[in-house]
């Protein structure tokens, strides 16, 4: 597994403890209580390091090559999954994976953005950058879910919509805008979870829902830290400063009422214990579905509308208040 800079101290300590335990089998150098003390010291070290991460270090965790992707969540959460392909207009976009899913006996339409896990699959998936047909595919499946009365799960993980000339020629902006319009009035519950990168319109085109949650180390932003640094300072190396200023992680976005919940990850990130992450996401999905399933359609749509209508509203003091 690829090591991130802040993980090196933890890994070195783990190796040292493993060596002690191996030698201890032969010579009994340490008692069981002393070994337990070493393990507890390791746990404290992990807690200290991972509770004091900078925003940029959390972006690195979010981008870790071993971080679970949509296809991993499908395998880890679903008892059954039937994939559906194509947008019925141009072609199938491999950057979107969607279909009928069964989770704990309940049927959903699960639609997610997929980056790939190795060089070959990343090229095939276009690194998770959707073309217009990807957004149209997602909308087609969402409307199918509405028709059959199925709740929808959107898994968001993209560095942004594909910015190439061919995508623009096929109406990239129009496809994203259409999704925003149509998803806002879709008469079925929609649960959105940002599992990795949630960047710009590429993320937003599949992130209109009744509840929006994020994994602890995922991010949701109008632009990547590198893109922001290039624009503001003409220096992409200032990505660490940009990551802090963008307020792109769950605790900040929950405070701004942009997301509703932050799902805890295992210590070190989802890639350290994927199975535990799948369980946490599954529990959240089922918990929210129970809250949404019995709402009248009119109330569901009104709450969804008000949720997004109020994002970005703020109050300023009047002149009389400031004079007082």
Swiss-Prot record:
Keyword Nucleotide-binding: yes
Database matches in SUPFAM superfamilies: ClpP/crotonase
EC number of the protein: 2.1.3.15
BP GO annotations: fatty acid biosynthetic process; malonyl-CoA biosynthetic process
Keywords per UniProt: ATP-binding, Cytoplasm, Fatty acid biosynthesis, Fatty acid metabolism, Lipid biosynthesis, Lipid metabolism, Nucleotide-binding, Transferase
Domain of life of the native organism: Bacteria
GO molecular function: acetyl-CoA carboxylase activity; ATP binding; carboxyl- or carbamoyltransferase activity
A UniProt-annotated Pfam family: ACCA
InterPro entries listed in its UniProt record: Acetyl_CoA_COase_a_su, ClpP/crotonase-like_dom_sf, COA_CT_C
PROSITE patterns per UniProt: COA_CT_CTER
GO cellular component: acetyl-CoA carboxylase complex
Domain CoA carboxyltransferase C-terminal, first and last residues per copy: 37-291
Keyword Nucleotide-binding part of the UniProt annotation: yes
Catalytic activity: N(6)-carboxybiotinyl-L-lysyl-[protein] + acetyl-CoA = N(6)-biotinyl-L-lysyl-[protein] + malonyl-CoA
Pathway given in the UniProt record: Lipid metabolism; malonyl-CoA biosynthesis; malonyl-CoA from acetyl-CoA: step 1/1
Compartments it resides in: Cytoplasm
PANTHER family: ACETYL-COENZYME A CARBOXYLASE CARBOXYL TRANSFERASE SUBUNIT ALPHA, ACETYL-COENZYME A CARBOXYLASE CARBOXYL TRANSFERASE SUBUNIT ALPHA, CHLOROPLASTIC
Chain's role: Component of the acetyl coenzyme A carboxylase (ACC) complex. First, biotin carboxylase catalyzes the carboxylation of biotin on its carrier protein (BCCP) and then the CO(2) group is transferred by the carboxyltransferase to acetyl-CoA to form malonyl-CoA.
Assembly, per entry: Acetyl-CoA carboxylase is a heterohexamer composed of biotin carboxyl carrier protein (AccB), biotin carboxylase (AccC) and two subunits each of ACCase subunit alpha (AccA) and ACCase subunit beta (AccD).
Family from the record: Belongs to the AccA family.
Name of protein: Acetyl-coenzyme A carboxylase carboxyl transferase subunit alpha
Organism: Chlamydia trachomatis serovar L2 (strain ATCC VR-902B / DSM 19102 / 434/Bu)
Higher taxonomy: Bacteria, Pseudomonadati, Chlamydiota, Chlamydiia, Chlamydiales
């Amino acid at each position: 597994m690829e090591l991130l800079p802040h993980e090196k101290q933890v890994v070195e300590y783990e190796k040292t403890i493993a060596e002690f335990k191996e030698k201890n089998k032969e010579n009994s150098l340490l008692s069981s209580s002393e070994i337990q003390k070493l393990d507890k010291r390791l746990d404290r070290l992990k807690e200290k390091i991972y509770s004091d991460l900078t925003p940029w270090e959390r972006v690195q965790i979010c981008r870790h090559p071993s971080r679970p992707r949509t296809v991993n969540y499908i395998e880890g959460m679903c008892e059954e999954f039937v994939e559906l392909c194509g947008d019925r207009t141009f072609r199938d976009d491999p950057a979107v994976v969607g279909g009928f899913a069964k989770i704990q006996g309940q049927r959903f339409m699960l639609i997610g953005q997929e980056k790939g896990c190795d060089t070959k699959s990343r090229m095939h998936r276009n690194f998770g950058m959707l073309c217009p047909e990807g957004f149209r595919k997602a909308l087609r499946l969402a409307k199918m879910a509405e028709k059959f009365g199925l709740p929808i799960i959107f898994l968001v993980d993209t560095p942004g919509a594909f910015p190439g000339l061919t995508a623009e020629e096929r109406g990239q902006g129009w496809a994203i805008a259409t999704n925003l319009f149509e998803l806002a009035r879709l008469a079925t519950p929609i649960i959105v979870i940002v599992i990795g990168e949630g960047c710009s319109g590429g993320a937003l085109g599949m992130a209109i829902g009744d509840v929006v949650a994020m994994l602890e180390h995922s991010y949701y932003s109008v632009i990547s830290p590198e893109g922001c640094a290039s624009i503001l300072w003409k220096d992409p190396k200032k990505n660490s400063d940009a990551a802090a200023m963008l307020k792109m992680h769950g605790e900040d976005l929950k405070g701004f009422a942009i997301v509703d919940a932050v799902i805890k990850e295992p210590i070190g990130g989802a890639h350290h214990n994927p199975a535990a992450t799948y369980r946490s996401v599954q529990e959240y999905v089922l918990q929210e579905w129970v809250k949404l399933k019995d709402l009248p359609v009119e109330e569901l749509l009104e709450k969804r509308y008000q949720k997004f209508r109020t994002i970005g509203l703020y109050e300023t003091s009047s002149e009389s208040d400031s004079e007082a």
